[in-house]
Structure formats: structure tokens, C-alpha cells
């Protein structure tokens, strides 16, 4: 299994420059609105997922691998709930804290490794969300069981898996798709089985693969438009590697060979 520091190198570097205007321009071009997301999440998807989470003022939501914190802050504003975000990377947490200081939402963030047991007591959250990050965590049965542990009975879970196997992949495509670090690939049917085994009732599965293909295409195109500036920040090799990454993500999703699903579940009990 690849070392997790390989992932940290990509994401740590990315978060250090995350607040710069050049990356904000890319996000605006790709998503239409800059939520501060470092995932495939669109505003329309965020609003749908918030409805599935069914959180409101007085509830506590855990955002696992929350990245820059932008979507978490938006959820806190939309719902009035308290959001607790955890992320592995120090620069991500620093960016999150700047958002909190500037906007004063009901949100707080801490650095924690989501591949290990989370630093929270049992049944301490009303909902858990994880967007486009479960695929970076090894031992999915243990991860889902830990999310169930921190959820109260009846609590909601929403997570997206952007690398569900739904077609044939060759070694070159896999190498590019995993070039940013560790990935765990499972078929959609395995996610369903693991959700049930962890103590959840699956409520719905949403196929967001078409949206993924378009978002990846737009991100690559936006970066092409800003290539000169991005090459200065990233260097030529890193820039070209990321462009190959976005191109392969778009192609595999457009051909429905690697799909993105959103899972909505409720903890039994």
C-alpha cells in the first residue's frame, strides 16, 4: 500500500496555496461559485446533501476530511447547526480557522487523521458527512464502523465515493488517476454491503457521475486558461501532471467506467 505521506505532499502543497487568487479563479470557472471546495462538490450537490443530512439549529454535524472548510462553513450558515470539521493537513486547518475568524459561524476545526479512530465520544453527533475523501482512507469497514460509533441512533450519514468501479480500466489510467496519492477502489455493490455491515440502513444512492465528468472537464479547461500563472506556482512537471489527472477523471467518468456515487444512510437503533 502506498505511504500516506504521498497524499500529504499533494494536498499539503495544494492547501498552502489554496487561498491565492489564481486558485480562486479556477474554482469560480469550474464550479460557477467558489465554495472553497477541494473536491468535486457543486453548490447544487451541497444543497441536496444538506437536505439529506436533515440537520438544524442545535444539531451537531461532523465533516470528515473537510479540506479547506468552505463547504462546512456554508452548511453552518444554511442550517444553524454546529459543524465540527477534521482534516489531516495543518494548512487546511489553518485555512479553516481563518474562515471561522472572518465569518463567525457555528463551526470549529481540528487536525486529525480520519484513517484512525476519531477523537470523539460515542453518539456525539447527529450527522456525519464525508465528501470525496473516503477513497483516500484504507480499511473501509473500520472507517464506516467508526462513523457509526460517533453517530447517535437514527443519525444520518452522507458520503461520496468518486472512484466506484463500473467498467474496465487499464494500468495507465489507474496510474494517472492515483497519481496524487493513495486510493481505495471498490465497486458500488461493495459499498452497499459495507454500509449495512457497519449498522446503517441505506436510504438512497445518487449517481453524480455525469456531474463529475463535467466538473473535471471544466477544472482542466480553467487551468489551461491560466496555465502561465499556474506553471509559475506549481512548476511545469506538477502542472502537466495535474492536467493529465483532470483529463483522465473526465474521460473515465464520461464513459462511466469510474463513477461517483453519493450514499445516504441512517444509523440503526
Question: Language model features by range: what are they?
Answer:
Residues 204-269:
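Conserved Class I S-adenosyl-L-methionine
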Residues 162-182:
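Short, glycine-/aromatic-enriched active-site segment of Class I SAM-dependent methyltransferases
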Residues 1-29:
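N-terminal, positively charged/glycine-rich alpha-helical extensions of SAM-dependent methyltransferases
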Residues 116-127:
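A short acidic, Gly/Pro-enriched loop at the edge of an enzyme's catalytic core
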Residues 62-64, 68-116:
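Class I SAM-dependent methyltransferase SAM/SAH-binding core
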Residues 184-199:
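Short alpha-helix
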Residues 39-57:
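Conserved alpha-helix/loop element of class I SAM-dependent methyltransferases that forms part
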Residues 141-156:
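A short glycine-rich, Lys/Arg-flanked "PGG" loop and its adjoining helix->strand segment in the class I
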